Amino acid sequence: MAAALADMADLEELSRLSPLSPGSPGPAARGRAEPPEEEEEEDDEEAEAEAVAALLLNGGAGGGAGGGEAETMSEPSPESASQAGGDEDEDEEDDEDEGSSSGGAEEESSAESLVGSSSGGCSGDETRSLSPGAASSSSGDGDGKEGLEEPKGPRGGPGGPGSSGGGSSSSSVVSSGGDEGYGTGGGGSSATSGGRRGSLEMSSDGEPLSRMDSEDSISSTLMDIDSTISSGRSTPAMMNGQGSTTASSKHIAYNCCWDQCQACFNSSPDLADHIRSIHVDGQRGGVFVCLWKGCKVYNTPSTSQSWLQRHMLTHSGDKPFKCVVGGCNASFASQGGLARHVPTHFSQQNSSKVSSQPKAKEESPSKAGMNKRRKLKNKRRRSLPRPHDFFDAQTLDAIRHRAICFNLSAHIESLGKGHSVVFHSTVIAKRKEESGKIKLLLHWMPEDILPDVWVNESERHQLKTKVVHLSKLPKDTALLLDPNIYRTMPQKRLKRFDILNFPR
């Protein structure tokens, strides 16, 4: 019986706390015409009837499965959205009336807990509000503020946002026209504007957030992530191994490509020292070869070790000979290249001192440039061509006449085939020896070329003529034939002339 009486008392309190009907005037409007005590009694009676009807309609809907959203089908009216705050005197009278009622504040808190448990449970059915125009009830604070306050009491259900506050005179339910509704208590007043649909979400720490706030926070978080990635800073995902923005440092390795050698070094001087000490100095026997893979002189024997040492510098890329002039970072693979480079600094200094003269072109240290300068120097030494040519027709006739006379005397062209001189003999003397033989003294024409000779009388017929090659003539007497036979010429050209004109 005690439990039944307690339930009846809870139902009475629940009916008294239920919202007003749409047609009933607000408590602020009635307060001007009726005394506060009569107003409270009428409100209690109407609330009891509406609460009983709501419990009969909803039944066990409040105890359904948790996790859903309680939706109200009624749209809030502008009249009910405005909350009428009473004066401080009316609040005190309400508190006295509530204190004198059966059950007191404890029964009110139990009734509010029942409301929170019945409305906070998650159900798939839609809950129809009996008072579609009522969106909020009057609060006991008396400050008349509108809006939502953070819940100060524990939440009503596991999935519902309804909460009950001890000592509060009413609990309000905010209907948002099909969106999620959150009822807040704890002495605070709540109201929603006419056409606005506000949805709330739960933050990470359990506090409700509006949808607009949550979207802004998500977009700002994404922008922070993008800026972090673009700036190259490490994020927690990168620290966990999901990403990496650190660039690997570039490292150049110098590999030895000598046959059957796989050594690797960090710099070209180290590679050059390795080649010189292991592969070059290690060769014995007087024969030196390059066994570098892909070399154009691969395995070509050489007798010069210094050549192999200079050649290996092309493979190692080392340039040990650096310029001694301050401020110059040039380096060379050979000492000769360094020797040709150093004078260019001083030639530039000398040319800069002479400002009036144009800047001289820098001499190239290459062999091609040196050969070109040598050729130009030799060309200047040669005599300039004569402006007048004295080889005219008269000179040509004189040369032709001398050639004809020479041919008549020597018969080079007619009988000697162009390379031999034909001599004719005449008897200038005759003698008889003791043995009885007769000898003749022959004189050769042209004169003064061949000496006179004594021959037997029987040989006279054979020695009427004698053919002698120009190369076999005595040089001291051959010039008597013609000065041009043995003219002065370079030794190389003379030998070539003899080979071409006097083949043996």
Swiss-Prot record:
Entry-linked PROSITE patterns: ZINC_FINGER_C2H2_1, ZINC_FINGER_C2H2_2
Disordered: region residues? 1-219, 345-387
Kindly give the SMART domains that the UniProt entry links to this protein. ZnF_C2H2
Parts of the chain that traverse the membrane: none
Assigned GO CC terms:
ESC/E(Z) complex; nucleus
Q: Ranges of Low complexity compositional bias?
A: 16-30, 129-140
Region annotation Interaction with RBBP4: residue ranges? 202-287
Please state which protein family the record places this protein in: Belongs to the AEBP2/jing C2H2-type zinc-finger family.
Q: What is this protein called?
A: Zinc finger protein AEBP2
Supply the source organism for this entry.
Mus musculus (Mouse)
Q: Which gene encodes it?
A: Aebp2
